[in-house]
C-alpha cells in the first residue's frame, strides 16, 4: 500500500495531464507547420486535420494551465490560513501559560508597586539630602584623580635589575638639538666606560 496522500496523487495526475497536453499541442503544431513548409494547401485534408487537432490541443493545454493556476492559488490560500491558525494557536498557548500577567489585578498591582517604589526612592533621596558628599559622585572624579596623582608622586619606582638595565639603555629625555645626537669622539687619554655588572 502506498504511503502517498490523496492530495499527492491528485497533484501527480494533474502534472501528468499537463505534460501530455503540452506535448500533444507541440506535436500537432509542428505537424501543421511542416505541412505548410512542404507546400500543402489549407484545403489539404491532412492540413485541415493537423490544424484542427493543433487548435484543440492548444485549447486543452490552456485549460490545463488555468486549472493548475487556480489549484495552486487555492492551495496557497490554504497554507496562509494554516500558518495564521498555527500562529494564533501558539500565541494563545503563551498567553494561557502566562495568564497572571494579563489579569487586571496583576496590572493594577504592578502599577501600584511601581508607584510605591518611586515614592520610596524619592523619600530616600530626601533623607540623604543635597549636601551629602557622594550625592554627585561619579566614577573617577576629581578626588580619584588627585589621589592617583599623589600615589604617582610619592611611590618610588621599582628597582628590579630589569628596570635598571632599561634605565641604562633608554634616555629619560629626548635631546632637542640634533647635534647632541651625534656620537662624541673618545679622548686618547680617556678610558672607555666599564660596563656595569651586578654581582
From Swiss-Prot:
<feature type="region of interest" description="Disordered">
    <location>
        <begin position="176"/>
        <end position="199"/>
    </location>
</feature>
<keyword id="KW-1035">Host cytoplasm</keyword>
<dbReference type="GO" id="GO:0019033">
    <property type="term" value="C:viral tegument"/>
</dbReference>
<protein>
    <recommendedName>
        <fullName>Tegument protein UL14 homolog</fullName>
    </recommendedName>
</protein>
<keyword id="KW-1048">Host nucleus</keyword>
<comment type="similarity">
    <text>Belongs to the alphaherpesvirinae HHV-1 UL14 protein family.</text>
</comment>
<keyword id="KW-0946">Virion</keyword>
<dbReference type="Pfam" id="PF03580">
    <property type="entry name" value="Herpes_UL14"/>
</dbReference>
<feature type="compositionally biased region" description="Polar residues">
    <location>
        <begin position="176"/>
        <end position="191"/>
    </location>
</feature>
<comment type="function">
    <text>Contributes to the nuclear transport of the viral transcriptional activator VP16 homolog during the early phase of infection. Therefore, participates indirectly in the regulation of the immediate-early gene expression. Additionally, seems to be important for efficient nuclear targeting of capsids.</text>
</comment>
<keyword id="KW-0920">Virion tegument</keyword>
<dbReference type="GO" id="GO:0030430">
    <property type="term" value="C:host cell cytoplasm"/>
</dbReference>
<dbReference type="GO" id="GO:0042025">
    <property type="term" value="C:host cell nucleus"/>
</dbReference>
<dbReference type="InterPro" id="IPR005207">
    <property type="entry name" value="Herpes_UL14"/>
</dbReference>
